[in-house]
Swiss-Prot record:
Pfam families: NHase_beta_C (PF02211), NHase_beta_N (PF21006)
UniProt name for this protein: Nitrile hydratase subunit beta
EC number assigned by the record: 4.2.1.84
GO MF: nitrile hydratase activity; transition metal ion binding
Catalytic activity: an aliphatic primary amide = an aliphatic nitrile + H2O
Top-level EC class: lyase
Keywords: Lyase
Species per Swiss-Prot/TrEMBL record: Rhodococcus erythropolis (Arthrobacter picolinophilus)
Length: 212
């Protein structure tokens, strides 16, 4: 799903300052910021009510202006709260009573997701691949900037994981696939105005096809 959550490579936001090996500071800057991860793993591991990919997708479903005005960790509080209402763990009235006022949630899903591909190709390190040029209305873990682009496999995981486009919607046909590190020339992704170098993207097998 294209949206405000996938801004990498989008023009108009200015240059991103970057210093190699810079100290980015602590993970959490306020006492409450660990809360969304605690809530998320309570819902995933303790209750078994939803998956991590469902959490990612529910954050993507936030109303765009709400998303842009909300701090990073607060988005995940909203996301987990939305899932708890959708799964029947809480009602929105109970949530707003606990919050002491209105508690805007993510928008309802407009997609049922899609099943994992039945047939995929296993790739080897050094093999050139093309990212499938697919526009998906629901959850997907493929950055828009690499759709249709050609890169080289630099690593294949030994583990397999549920296909995000399915499990992110709570489907039971997610299957399991390995992921690959795919190395792209910066020019392949962003054109000749880049400062050179390369970009490595972690992609599921179902997103890839052999490059011609």
């Amino acid at each position: 799903m294209d949206g405000v959550h996938d801004l990498a490579g989008v023009q108009g936001f200015g240059k991103v300052p970057h210093t190699v090996n810079a100290d980015i500071g602590p993970t959490f800057h306020a006492e409450w910021e660990h809360l969304p991860y605690s809530l998320m793993f309570a819902g995933v591991a303790e209750l078994g009510a939803f998956s991590v990919d469902e959490v990612r997708y529910v954050v993507e479903r936030m109303e765009p202006r709400h998303y842009m005005m909300t701090p990073y960790y607060e988005r995940y509080v909203i996301g987990v709260a939305t899932l708890m209402v959708e799964k029947g763990i809480l009602t929105q009235d109970e949530l707003e009573s606990l919050a002491g006022g209105p508690f805007p949630l993510s928008r309802p899903s407009e997609s049922e997701g899609r099943p994992a591909p039945v047939e995929t190709t296993t790739f080897e390190v050094g093999q050139r691949v093309r990212v499938r040029d697919e526009y998906v209305p629901g959850h997907i873990r493929m950055p828009a900037y690499c759709r249709g682009r050609v890169g080289t496999i630099s690593h294949r995981t030994t583990e397999k994981w549920p296909f995000p486009d399915a499990i992110g919607h709570g489907r039971n046909d997610a299957g399991e696939e390995p992921t690959y590190h795919v190395k792209f020339a910066a020019e392949e992704l962003f054109g000749s105005d880049t400062d050179g170098g390369s970009v490595v993207v972690d992609l599921f097998e179902g997103y890839l096809e052999p490059a011609a």
